């Protein structure tokens, strides 16, 4: 499997703070689900900001499809990579269809927006893939939390990017909707061959739905391997700095 993202010797720090990353090296495989794990402050959110060009004052290199990330315009990057953030500002009095339509903006003339036949086809495809086609005319404020998360994922599909980043996609959802969202993510990865990068706190979800795990501790990668290899109490205790118990291939307490 070829690499779609390569990070080489990357270093970064926020103003006067100590370095978040020092000579970080990481590769993300094309067409796989890679999950970033670690306790708060380990660098997960910063890594997402780096990949999305929200942070650019780093040293080292980030390559996306063998091209230096800094050389991408934001509009060009938006055709390659889409993100569902943990805390999104959601317009309330707008239909699901119209909200998903916003995802087509990277393909439009900045001075003149006109929805094309291709735009409508991409939007409807995204709604069907996320089981929202029957809700296309529903006002967003009427949706449940799980349905709203599907809308954000539909926006990524309509944006037509090969890479999707999901920052805590199951946060604030009940167990039923958590499972539903994770199954959707896995299906989209398998059927559409998308490269998906997730940030998760739930270790069992990470093991169940990921191909690869990248575990961070104080800005360093201490594990970058197949998901099942995370079932190691000593390793998990180190990652989270707390006692974690595993039973029958599941984390039962932490």
Predicted regions located by residue number:
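A short, flexible loop at the N-terminus of ABC-type nucleotide-binding domains that lies
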Residues: 1-7, 11-23, 71-73, 91
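The feature captures the beta-strand-to-loop junction immediately N-terminal to the Walker
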Residues: 37-39
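Helix-to-loop junction immediately C-terminal to a conserved catalytic motif
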Residues: 52
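Conserved ABC transporter NBD signature motif
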Residues: 60-68, 77
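Conserved ABC ATPase signature
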Residues: 139-143
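Catalytic Walker B motif of ABC-type/P-loop ATPase nucleotide-binding domains
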Residues: 164-168
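ABC ATPase nucleotide-binding domains
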Residues: 239-254
